[in-house]
């Protein structure tokens, strides 16, 4: 899938964390989970839904996974530093810090607590309009 112009620099890598990947898989696997992603896919052409399911269950090579093994200690340190976030947000902030990366969120999933914690710690963030 081509990346829209201006979305990210040509050499930039995209990563996801284990919990966020699990969340996407769960949204697609369960008919009882209703969120933004499952609603969009439920209303789409079946071929689009099948392609999305394949892309989520078999994470594309272009998306690098960040191991919980690499994030458990940084997450514990964030908590010790007084960061108060839920587990998914804590993992995302730890991953961004671990990778020295920009923390990107969809505007539909804007998370004021995560954005504030990142700002306090000097981590760059970006809201992506999907």
Per-region residue spans from a language model:
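Extended, non-globular alpha-helical segments
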Residues: 43-67
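Acidic, PIN/NYN-like endoribonuclease modules and their adjacent C-terminal/linker elements
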Residues: 16-17, 21, 93, 97-130
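Structural alpha-beta junctions
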Residues: 9-13, 57-63, 120-125
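Active-site neighborhoods of divalent-metal-dependent phosphate/nucleic-acid chemistry enzymes
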Residues: 58-106
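Amphipathic alpha-helical segments within well-ordered protein domains
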Residues: 25, 29-32, 57-60, 76
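Short, well-structured N-terminal submotif of metal-dependent ribonuclease cores
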Residues: 1-40, 44
């Amino acid at each position: 899938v081509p990346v829209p112009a201006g979305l990210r620099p040509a050499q930039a890598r995209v990563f996801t964390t284990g919990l966020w990947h699990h969340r996407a898989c769960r949204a697609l696997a369960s008919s009882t989970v209703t969120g933004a992603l499952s609603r969009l896919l439920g209303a789409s052409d079946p071929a689009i839904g099948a392609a999305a399911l394949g892309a989520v269950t078999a994470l594309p090579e272009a998306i690098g996974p960040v191991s919980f093994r690499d994030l458990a200690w940084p997450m514990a340190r964030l908590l010790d530093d007084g960061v108060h976030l839920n587990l998914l947000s804590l993992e995302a902030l730890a991953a961004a810090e671990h990778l020295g990366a920009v923390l990107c969120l969809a505007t539909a999933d804007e998370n004021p607590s995560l954005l504030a914690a990142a700002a306090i710690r000097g981590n760059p963030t970006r809201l992506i309009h999907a």
